[in-house]
């Protein structure tokens, strides 16, 4: 589903059967195929309030999510519909329709609370749908929001400063939209026109008083204002006054509905398509379809085990899976690019190392892009080990290819020489000179052959070594030479052989140096890209912390302006803690990153020193190649 899913109808994502929540594997399989970022819109509200109609409209259909034309609630659990996003390229719009809250047919009301909490955790835009007006009763019916502190955790362990875990909800909670259906009031306050958003904000103002009833009424208002910094309201007229049309609204054309209702619905959909955010987790981790599936499974498993869904734990679970996939993705990219770009044998080792460096640099970037929360760089080290092994394979293939190619060329060039030796053509007076001239022509022709690769000298050296006994025999049997001339020829041959061995050793030492420089370059590239990623993560964390502080300060100031001084003072501890967090993030930047990079540098040094075996391969491992590809001379 890289280019967008093709779901013709919604499927159940989370089943709610016999008071037990269960993730539907069919839905997970659909999400697994969506690697695009997702915009997730969830709608929640009392049953029979028309939630499904709005979701169908967002999907561009007038049917799909079951509407139900009776007082019986149709939707059970959470249903999902994935459609290509109409205005965000390469994004998928995931619509989540939840079963109606407060259904009298349901047994355990706790399931309503879990459905509500799951919708908050999974979506990036949370739509609360109610009827008629936002009044005291409507807010009381939204008591589920007050239970979120008991049903969701940001951190896996309590904070040492004693500040409530829920203070961090604002960093990952969705945008909050309140849709009011069959709205009949005038949008006015104290005789003055107001906007829909102003209507909502006025309804969320706290009521003065200390009695339990007032406090109970204020609690959902307070929670909405504290947990959801971005809020918006949409009101809708009644779709039609015709009861028959209402009962079959999924079969009714838009033209048969009230024009004002049509306009309001289109405005709502346009806002969702334009402003609904891509789903992210803390510190800017983008959620794709497959990641959303993992989150759903993780949260439901936590609920069924009797635990509370925890964002931190969910991110850790997600990171383990995603980082393993990132290692594989980056390593596969490296292999594919090397196979495409490198033509074996390379003329020099440096040519291969340069290509390796380029492909590795791009592969590291891919790993960085798709990994997160890589504690102690565990997965980056796995990626490095994998890449080093793959690099070693390419080095061996390059050497083997060079050996094969050079041997084939030498076989071709020395064919006449070998035939002359077999025929005894050099076993005559003056035969040694003739033999040497023939061998020199072979050497000249051999070095004219292009792109012989890294084993060119070594293969030719072995050829010369294979000829030493033959040359000695021809030399000693040549009656045209004096003993002194023969002795001089022997000395010259030994000297030339020693010089060629020195050249070969020099090449191997140079290649060792190139290998070590390449490893150092690899280490530095890994550290540089990690440093850039850590700095970006730190900047995102700082922005997140500043956002939490500013929102908390706004809420605190609002309490003061509305006359709730005690609530204002109660938030001082939270604000002080946010300021300390920001100071720590700002001031501990360099030491923290430096420590992480130092640790990685040590680990990479250990990893990269292991392929010393590969470096040494050029010195002591080549004999195995010659055993596999024996020379015929």
Curated annotation (Swiss-Prot):
Q: Which GO terms describe its molecular function?
A: GTP binding; GTPase activity
Q: Where is this region: GTPase domain (Globular)?
A: 1-310
Q: Which keywords does UniProt give here?
A: Antimicrobial, Cytoplasmic vesicle, GTP-binding, Hydrolase, Immunity, Innate immunity, Nucleotide-binding, Ubl conjugation
What does the record say about PTM? (Microbial infection) Ubiquitinated by S.flexneri IpaH9.8, leading to its degradation by the proteasome, thereby preventing its ability to promote host defense against bacterial infection.
Which residues are GTP-binding? 45-52, 67-69, 97-101
Q: What is its main location?
A: cytoplasm
- Say which domain of life the source belongs to: Eukaryota
SUPFAM superfamilies, per the entry: Interferon-induced guanylate-binding protein 1 (GBP1), C-terminal domain, P-loop containing nucleoside triphosphate hydrolases
Q: What CDD domains does UniProt report for this protein, alphabetically?
A: GBP, GBP_C
- Domain named GB1/RHD3-type G: residues: 35-277
Enzyme Commission number, as recorded: 3.6.5.-
Entry-linked Pfam families: GBP, GBP_C
Cellular localisation? Cytoplasmic vesicle
Does the UniProt entry include the keyword Ubl conjugation? yes
Signal peptide as annotated in the record: none
Q: Name one GO cellular component term.
A: cytoplasmic vesicle
Reaction catalysed by this enzyme: GTP + H2O = GDP + phosphate + H(+)
Q: Which GO terms describe its biological process?
A: cellular response to type II interferon; defense response to bacterium; defense response to Gram-positive bacterium; defense response to protozoan; immune response
Record-stated family: Belongs to the TRAFAC class dynamin-like GTPase superfamily. GB1/RHD3 GTPase family. GB1 subfamily.
Summarize the protein's role.
Interferon (IFN)-inducible GTPase that plays important roles in innate immunity against a diverse range of bacterial, viral and protozoan pathogens, such as bacterial pathogens Listeria monocytogenes and Mycobacterium bovis BCG as well as the protozoan pathogen Toxoplasma gondii. Confers protection to several pathogens, including the bacterial pathogens Listeria monocytogenes and Mycobacterium bovis BCG as well as the protozoan pathogen Toxoplasma gondii.
Q: What is this protein called?
A: Guanylate-binding protein 6
What gene name does this entry carry?
GBP6
């Amino acid at each position: 589903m890289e280019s967008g899913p093709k779901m013709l109808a919604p499927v159940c994502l989370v089943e709610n059967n016999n008071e037990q929540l269960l993730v539907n594997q069919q839905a997970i399989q659909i999400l697994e195929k969506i690697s695009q970022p997702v915009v997730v819109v969830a709608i929640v509200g009392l049953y029979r309030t028309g939630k499904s109609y709005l979701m169908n409209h967002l999907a561009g259909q007038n049917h799909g999510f079951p509407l139900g034309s009776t007082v019986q609630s149709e939707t059970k659990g959470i249903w999902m519909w994935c459609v290509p996003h109409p205005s965000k390229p390469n994004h998928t719009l995931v619509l989540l329709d939840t079963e109606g809250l407060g259904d009298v047919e349901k047994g355990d009301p706790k399931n309503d609370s879990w459905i509500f909490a799951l919708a908050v955790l999974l979506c990036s835009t949370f739509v609360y749908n109610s009827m008629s007006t936002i009044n005291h009763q409507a807010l009381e019916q939204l008591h589920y929001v007050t239970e979120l502190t008991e049903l969701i955790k940001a951190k896996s362990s309590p904070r040492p400063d004693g500040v409530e875990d829920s203070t961090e909800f604002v960093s990952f909670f969705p945008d909050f939209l309140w849709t009011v259906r069959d709205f009949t009031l005038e949008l006015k306050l104290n005789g003055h026109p107001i906007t829909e958003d102003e209507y909502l904000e006025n309804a969320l103002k706290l009521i003065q008083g200390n009695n339990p009833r007032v406090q109970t009424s204020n609690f959902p208002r307070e929670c909405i204002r504290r947990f959801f910094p971005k809020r918006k309201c949409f009101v809708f007229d009644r779709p039609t006054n015709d009861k028959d049309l209402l009962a079959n609204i999924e079969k009714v054309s838009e033209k048969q509905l009230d024009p004002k209702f049509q306009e309001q619905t289109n405005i709502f959909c346009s806002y969702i398509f334009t402003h609904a955010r891509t789903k992210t987790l803390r510190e800017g981790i983008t959620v794709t379809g497959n990641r959303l599936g993992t989150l759903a499974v993780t949260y439901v498993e936590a609920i069924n085990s009797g635990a509370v869904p925890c964002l931190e734990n969910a991110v850790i679970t997600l990171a383990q899976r995603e980082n393993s996939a990132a290692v594989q993705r980056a390593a596969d990219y490296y292999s594919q690019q090397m196979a495409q770009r490198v033509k074996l044998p390379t003329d020099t080792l440096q040519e291969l190392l340069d290509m390796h460096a380029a492909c590795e640099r791009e592969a590291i970037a891919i790993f960085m892009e798709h990994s997160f929360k890589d504690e102690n760089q565990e997965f980056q080290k796995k990626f490095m080990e994998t890449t080093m092994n793959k690099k070693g394979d390419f080095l061996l293939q390059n050497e083997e290819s060079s050996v094969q190619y050079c041997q084939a060329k030498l076989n071709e060039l020395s064919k006449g020489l070998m035939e002359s030796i077999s025929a005894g053509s050099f076993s005559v007076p003056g035969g040694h000179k003739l033999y040497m001239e023939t061998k020199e022509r072979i050497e000249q022709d051999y070095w004219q052959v292009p792109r012989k690769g890294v084993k060119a000298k070594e293969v030719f050296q072995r050829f010369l070594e294979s000829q030493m006994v033959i040359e000695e025999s021809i030399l000693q049997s040549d009656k045209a030479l004096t003993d002194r001339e023969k002795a001089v020829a022997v000395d010259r041959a030994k000297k030339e052989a020693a010089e060629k061995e020195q050249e070969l050793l020099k090449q191997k030492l140079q290649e060792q140096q190139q290998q070590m420089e390449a490893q150092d370059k690899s280490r530095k590239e890994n550290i540089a890209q990690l440093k850039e990623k850590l700095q970006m993560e730190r900047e995102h964390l700082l922005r997140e912390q500043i956002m939490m502080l500013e929102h908390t300060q706004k809420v605190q100031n609002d309490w003061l302006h509305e006359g709730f001084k005690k609530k204002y003072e109660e938030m001082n501890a939270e604000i002080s803690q946010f300021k300390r967090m920001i100071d720590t993030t700002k001031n501990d930047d360099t030491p923290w990153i430096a420590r992480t990079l130092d640790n990685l540098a040590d680990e990479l040094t250990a990893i990269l020193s292991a392929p010393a075996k590969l470096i040494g391969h050029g010195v002591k491992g080549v004999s195995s190649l010659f055993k596999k590809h024996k020379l015929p001379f």
